[in-house]
């Protein structure tokens, strides 16, 4: 019951502000860092549609390759339950797409020479 009165927005004025006609509300003391800022445009947002088309094409190719290899495995071995069926209508979130995009870039670049195997101390 006491919480409802605490939720009211209070205005505070000192003598100088009262003379100038300026009143502050709660939250005015915070600087610009807390105000809403526009979203910065980053690389993957600029080429989003183009990149998504490339990724979708690559994913489709991989699904087709996977489907053909899965059917070959199934006909050769005839072991049910060990071969996963491809999902044609799989939903992939943006974060997953970004992860796989970064993974593809890392694979294309080659081996990372600052790996855990080497002691760099």
Curated annotation (Swiss-Prot):
Region (Disordered) location: 1-28, 60-81
InterPro entries per record: DUF4612 (IPR027967)
Residues carrying Phosphoserine: 95, 115
The keyword Lipid biosynthesis is annotated on this UniProt entry: no
Keywords, in A-Z order: Phosphoprotein
Pfam families named in the record: DUF4612
Keyword Thylakoid (UniProt): no
Transmembrane segments: none
Name listed for the protein in its UniProt record: Uncharacterized protein C1orf21 homolog
Organism of provenance: Mus musculus (Mouse)
